UniProtKB/Swiss-Prot annotation:
Organism: Hydra vulgaris (Hydra)
Predominant cellular place of this UniProt entry's protein: secreted
GO annotation, biological process: defense response to bacterium; defense response to virus; innate immune response
GO molecular-function term, one example from the UniProt record: chitin binding
Stretches the record annotates as Disordered: 32-80
One Pfam family named in its UniProt record: CBM_14
UniProt induction comment: By a wide variety of microbial and tissue components such as bacterial flagellin and lipopolysaccharides (LPS), dsRNA (reflecting an antiviral response), cell death signals, monosodium urate (MSU) (the end product of the urine catabolism, which is one of the principal endogenous immunological 'danger signal' in vertebrates).
Localization in the cell: Secreted
Region forming the signal peptide: 1-17
Name assigned to this protein: Periculin-1
Key word Secreted present: yes
Length: 158
């Protein structure tokens, strides 16, 4: 019985050792691959030959760069471009809106029943309450104020 246990354990150890030796050989091949297999893999028959300008360590002339990227087609914007329409109180106020330098929209200096404001760079309609009119000359950052019929427009405050 004791001999069977020793025999079985020696067979297991022998199989494990054989497997260990094979994996060690594979590991060694992965770390140090044979040089003959990879010798010509990255070498090409057509070697790159730089131009004479590069051989002499000269920079190519500016005209070479310009000619390389130059196109005979010049950009021509469409002649029929129209800005996005701005509708306020169901009225197209695109012509009356000014896109101010601060990114806000406002109706021109004429009093209106509503005005255009800009929230997150999107034009929205801000109607004045009943009985009030819009004055574009006043307000913070070009948004204007709603004023009563007899109120005077003050100078714009920034």
């Amino acid at each position: 019985m004791f001999m069977k246990i020793i025999f079985i354990s020696s067979v297991i150890i022998l199989a494990a050792a054989d497997e260990f030796i094979e994996s060690e050989d594979q590991y060694d091949l992965n770390i140090n691959p044979p040089k003959e297999e990879y010798k010509n893999q990255y070498e090409s028959n057509n070697e790159y030959q730089p131009t004479s300008e590069y051989n002499n360590n000269k920079k190519p002339s500016k005209t070479d760069y310009e000619n390389q990227y130059e196109s005979s087609n010049k950009y021509q914007p469409k002649s029929g471009y129209k800005p996005k329409k701005v509708i306020c109180l169901d009225i197209d106020v695109t012509k009356q809106c000014k896109n101010r330098a601060d990114g806000n929209y406002a109706i021109d200096n004429k009093p209106r029943a509503g005005y255009i404001a800009c929230v997150n760079k999107s034009p929205i309609c801000m109607p004045c309450p009943y009985g009030l009119t819009f004055c574009a000359k006043t307000g913070y950052k070009g948004l204007g104020h709603c004023l009563g019929e007899y109120d005077e427009c003050q100078s714009r405050s920034y």
